[in-house]
UniProtKB/Swiss-Prot annotation:
Protein name, UniProt field: Nucleoside diphosphate kinase
Molecular function per GO: ATP binding; metal ion binding; nucleoside diphosphate kinase activity
Record-level GO cellular component terms: cytoplasm
Disulfide bonds: none
Catalytic activity: a 2'-deoxyribonucleoside 5'-diphosphate + ATP = a 2'-deoxyribonucleoside 5'-triphosphate + ADP; a ribonucleoside 5'-diphosphate + ATP = a ribonucleoside 5'-triphosphate + ADP
EC number: 2.7.4.6
Length: 161
């Protein structure tokens, strides 16, 4: 039986919010069959930005990254589904939107390395999804619910023989 309850952290970055792309980005994840279990429209402060991007602290682009991510509101989310972390990364596309394949979120909407619209937990960094979820959400902000469509997304949940 496939595990359908992997959770991952996703965020529409300030450029995506300013460009009115929250809805389109949410739609991409919903139509893939993933299930939203948390969402928060918020402004990231300096301290949270430093924690969230701690792995990039020593990179030359770090200060610019912090100033970008705190420059306007973001839409932070938690999504659930089979292989959710890697599935979201595939939908996002390559980090540099100029290299991201058409059909991906960054490939279709972006044209820049820094302004690349969406963050998703790194599936190659063990536990990054859980760490990032805990950084942005309290347990009681996450909603357990059954998505009826899941039975039509995952064959092993179906009623038919
Ligand atoms: P990811 O968002 O695809 O996981 P990371 O390597 O984790 O990519 O980098 C985090 C974010 O930092 C990227 O999404 C991008 O906005 C920004 N970034 C990464 N590399 C550079 C760079 O070389 N110059 C400027 N910004 C960068
Ligand atoms: Mg990353």
């Amino acid at each position: 039986m496939t595990d359908h309850d992997e959770r991952t952290f996703v965020m529409v970055k300030p450029d995506g919010v300013q460009r009115g792309l929250i809805g389109d980005i949410v739609t991409r994840l919903e139509t893939k069959g993933l299930k939203m279990v948390g969402g928060k429209f918020m402004r990231i402060d300096e301290e949270l930005a430093h924690e969230h991007y701690a792995e990039h602290e020593d990179k030359p682009f770090f200060d610019g990254l912090v100033s970008f991510i705190t420059s306007g509101p973001v839409f932070a989310m938690v999504w659930e589904g089979a292989d959710a972390t890697r599935q979201v990364r595939q939908l996002m596309g390559a980090t540099d939107a100029q290299d991201a394949a058409p059909g991906t979120i960054r490939g279709d909407y972006g044209n820049d390395l820094g302004h690349n619209l969406i963050h998703g937990s790194d599936h190659e960094d063990e536990g990054a999804n859980e760490r990032e979820i805990a950084l942005f959400f309290d347990d009681d902000e996450l909603v357990d619910w059954d998505r009826d469509a899941s039975a039509w997304v995952y064959e092993d949940l179906a009623d038919h023989d």
